[in-house]
């Protein structure tokens, strides 16, 4: 059956969360937002495209930094309200220059930094 981005469940702002996962390691890299057009652009181009809520514009991951996300697989969850994009990540995924945006853990009530920025 052909995929139609309009069949996804978007929030009131027309957005859906998209979790990026490294295709080789399974590591969760980041979470960002997509709208229907970002979904379509991602599937058409093979380059993961998000919607920047702060800039109110499309954000092709790595367009300015070179830290691109090449789409490997695109999955829809059971409620159709969240996406999982598995990617080939070039360089760090996080704007803090870390491999993953999930670099802080809470352990025994304390925040622990799990990874330092890449050089």
UniProtKB/Swiss-Prot annotation:
GO term, biological process aspect, one: L-histidine biosynthetic process
How are cofactors bound according to the entry's free-text note?
A: Binds 1 Mg(2+) ion per subunit. Binds 1 zinc ion per subunit.
Q: In the UniProt record, does the keyword Zinc occur?
A: yes
Q: Which controlled-vocabulary keywords does the entry list?
A: Amino-acid biosynthesis, Cytoplasm, Histidine biosynthesis, Hydrolase, Magnesium, Metal-binding, Zinc
Where does this protein hold Mg(2+)? 77, 79, 81
EC class, as a word, reads hydrolase
User: Which cell locations does it reside in?
Assistant: Cytoplasm
Q: Which cofactor does it need?
A: Mg(2+); Zn(2+)
- Reactions accelerated catalytically: 1-(5-phospho-beta-D-ribosyl)-5'-AMP + H2O = 1-(5-phospho-beta-D-ribosyl)-5-[(5-phospho-beta-D-ribosylamino)methylideneamino]imidazole-4-carboxamide
Q: Name one GO molecular function term.
A: zinc ion binding
Pathway as given in its UniProt record: Amino-acid biosynthesis; L-histidine biosynthesis; L-histidine from 5-phospho-alpha-D-ribose 1-diphosphate: step 3/9
Keyword Metal-binding attached: yes
Signal sequence bounds: none
EC number per UniProt: 3.5.4.19
Give the primary localization class: cytoplasm
A cellular component annotation (GO) from this entry: cytoplasm
Q: Which positions are annotated as binding Zn(2+)?
A: 78, 94, 101
Q: Which NCBIfam families match?
A: PRK00051.1
Reported function:
Catalyzes the hydrolysis of the adenine ring of phosphoribosyl-AMP.
Q: What family does the entry list?
A: Belongs to the PRA-CH family.
**Assembly and interaction partners:** Homodimer.
User: What is the protein name stated in its UniProt record?
Assistant: Phosphoribosyl-AMP cyclohydrolase
Q: Which organism is it from?
A: Ruegeria pomeroyi (strain ATCC 700808 / DSM 15171 / DSS-3)
